[in-house]
């Protein structure tokens, strides 16, 4: 079979076909209201020499050499970067993608400040001539800016006139040069207009707004008493923010740094899209948020220093058992080691006789992008955060740590670049920006021009996401981790058994070791147990990265696939995890303006303001300080009674059992410490944000599901986090609000399958327990602790007690989010897709006086099967027939629609059977096997049409993944290259990422690691694609439904938050939200989704041929129709027949979400 190297090449000026063999962009919409983005077909090119292909420019991803070029440019190493640039030019002459690289090179020379204009001009001319290209408007803008430099003014003004003359001679427009707001300030624009005698009236008012030309700019005056970025009111004394009394220096130092904004004159550029006007507090909080993001890393080091000095002042000269002080001792040594490493890198770069393949020449330019201070602080913060993640309670893989460290350095570098770019933005005038916000037409035009400008300035001027190659990330991370391991020491104490005294010894805080996982030897970094104890001891965590925290202001609205959320960190709208194809689709959909509604919806989720529930926080502090285990809160110390070593035993098995038990207890203890550290993180964040209003920026997974970008404390987390969080904006309960609070509390006790009246009565009957819980949460009956979600229940008890005792509950201001959950939401979508009336009734799409319980319905069918088998003499059926409850089948029913495998379902049922009285442990596996088959059989009988749709989706996926474009087959390319791609109703393109990526061996300072090469040319995994497609498709539907509901609520000024298929709002707005979410569901499914999907597949994969082996049909029939051909035209099977369900019935179903 002919094998070819497939080089993906995305042309900016030509339409090419996609990797899946598809035309990339449609010239017309498939449908009237949504636009599927199609894929690229590979640009087939003969394999070039090993050196040559390194320098082929590829827009779809950045090669290691391209990233190295950028790193050298940003480091000011213009000699090496020019050498690399010339190499690119030699292999890509005439290709316009060279222009952004040339522009970046010119821009960095200019922005360094010290340059000769003649050198800049000659450099630009030389590079452009070698590349056989003409400069674009950005090239001319940069050169014009250089000519305006005060040190070059005598020579510069004639050059300016010549540049503009040349640009006009090439039929260019001056406005195209001036519109590069990242290059010119308004004053520079005005100076150019004056020099060229361009009348103001040549520009439209909208263009003048975007150029930054205001009346004050024209007159040349600045308003007295006002800051350039806003009015004098910003300078006025702001009200003090109430602080929380605490031992930690972390918050005090942070608040100290923030308070400087009250008294000092600080220029804070105002973001062109994000700032809401009319509230001084918003402006102040924006300043605090930006300061937090910009300076928190180095502020952490200051906190560590403060704590360390405090310990020394107390006269304790030993190694201190205090997190901050310990970190500072590491930080000081680590910073020095980074300085020495950077010095070695600089020396090596000057020594031309050394081996050019030396690793320092490869990773050095990247390491130098950050200061040694930041490198040291980030290294400690990143390793500490991973160490406290419960997933790594037995240690973290070296590859995970190296990747995390390297990516954290890259993110910080991107953050610095964003801060730098902000200084050059033209939207610095708050008054002018306010005019844009007050004129919707001008604002829309401004956003459009910004989008065009971003495209015009190109990706090299704005470093892309994950642009550092994986090999570089690993090498940089390895350097940092090796340096940390050499300095990270911790003091441990032990009792001297001979003297009874205390022994102290300094040991490594982290150990590099190896463990076996699935038969493979894996490098691990294991923290010392004393380090875990230290982290979990106090509420003191000065190592939280600002990019992991909630925000003090409304997050930056999403305006493109790569621009939104935090202000000084860049993350994509969709969490890509190296899925390059998803980037391709997402980027083009964003550029085409097709994601505007999705941007609006994700931004709306971020606009919801939150606060900490102070009453619940106080309860948690009491529990935490007690050090005892309570519900899900881990204890301070885990007591593990280790049996004595059987040294006198003659049975070797006794010693094996003892060692096994020892490992189990050690793992238990380490896991408990890790969980306490994780809980400590959450509590620390809550403490820091007491008395604050804050927000959660959101992003999506590849299926479109929304998640907060913030880590640890957010509403998608556990019961404790959800209980701690409430809406910062309160609303009166109104006539029905108290009843909804009662329904909410009953749901938290697991009484969610009763009618609303019964749920309300449950709370009324236990009202004295509610009062007792609110008054004496830890000293009373603790009735709240018996709830399924106890901490949320306690928060609800506080709210209900206060509302009832207020005397006027309708006027009581409520902050608690009321949760309305779908009934096995995946099955709801399947029932609507298939028009399944019986299925619809089971999942509350059909109106009823009481909610249906699908889990009980399945359990009843299973019991019927078992009774029948028992009557036939089956022993297992006879034992199980009276023991199968809804709780036994619930996990399998919930996950069946999301693709749970038989093995996964059997494990779920095994765990339930183990708790049944009389069940012998040795028989669990056999009984679980038997029962799993019966549950699957029951589900198929109850949801026939849902399974028919699942089968159709899997069959289509199987055909797609075994298909290729006809021209590929002719050329002998028969690899399985085609993934499944579809488009949601909100125009989000979804590409399934399951491919057979090859591993690449990377040698680092610490050890050899293996990383996946995320390559578009990797073959797909047909089985994984097929099994994952049905659940992924349903996930994309429930995400679309959530966003449609979000948009409707936003239009009605209703606070809306969501955890997938659980929708939250104020108690007074529950009825209205329920009405809107029903309308959104009907609207979604009125679009004939399955027919649309089939049409999209037929258009997307038009002209494809599929392997005959992939088609489940009679061989004789295929042979008669196609002869002996191995590949035949791709045809999709007909859709399953749809039932007679009237979707409008959903509008009448009050238990649809409840």
From Swiss-Prot:
Presequence range in chain numbering: 1-30
Catalysed reactions, as listed in the record:
RNA(n) + a ribonucleoside 5'-triphosphate = RNA(n+1) + diphosphate
A single GO BP term for this record reads: transcription initiation at mitochondrial promoter
Q: Which InterPro entries match?
A: DNA-dir_Rpol_C_phage-type, DNA-dir_Rpol_phage-type, DNA/RNA_pol_sf, RNA_POL_N_sf, RPOL_N
Q: Which residues form the active site?
A: 821, 890, 1061
Query: What keywords are annotated for this sequence in UniProt?
Result: DNA-directed RNA polymerase, Mitochondrion, Nucleotidyltransferase, Transcription, Transferase, Transit peptide
- Report the protein name in the record: DNA-directed RNA polymerase, mitochondrial
Q: List the source organism.
A: Schizosaccharomyces pombe (strain 972 / ATCC 24843)
